[in-house]
Amino acid sequence: MENQYIYRVNASSTTLRSGIAVAEEIEPSITFSAPPEFQGEPGHWTPEHFFVAAVAGCFISTFSGIAHFSKFEFLSLELETEGTIAKDEGGWRFTQVTLRPRLKIAQEKDLDRAKRLLEKAERSCLVVRSLTTLVTMEPDIVLEEEFIERQKMGNSVPIS
C-alpha cells in the first residue's frame, strides 16, 4: 500500500535492564539500557533518549524537506531537544518535549519565512503528530553576520 509504511526493530535483552536494538539493513546496532536513575547501566542510550532522538531526527528531516520544496536556503540548522518525564497516577511518562532549533540564514529578508517554515516543520513532523505529549518550540533564527558576532561574544539571543 502506497500510503502506509512499516518500520521494524528487533530488540533483545543482553543483561538486566539492558539490551541491543537491530533494524534490518541498518548499521550499527544500538546497545541500550534503562537510565541510571532506574537502575540501568550508565553510558548507554536509553529508551528515553531514543524517544527524544526520534522527535529531533524527525524535526530536522521534516524541516529540511520543507525548505527544499519551498526553495528556502539556509546555512545551517542545529537542534537541541529536551524531553521531561514525570510520574503521574499511571506511572512515568513524557510530559513535555522542547525543541530549540538554531537556524542560521544569510539574509534578513528571510527571517519571517524562516520562522514560518520552522513552525510548519513542527506541525508536520510525523513523530510530533503522533504524540500526546506537549511539544513546544523555542526557535533561534540567526543571520550569518550576527552568528559570527555571537560566536565572538559567546552568547545567544533569540530573534522573534
Q: Which positions does each model-derived feature cover?
A:
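Extended beta-strand/beta-hairpin segments
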Residues: 1-53, 63-160
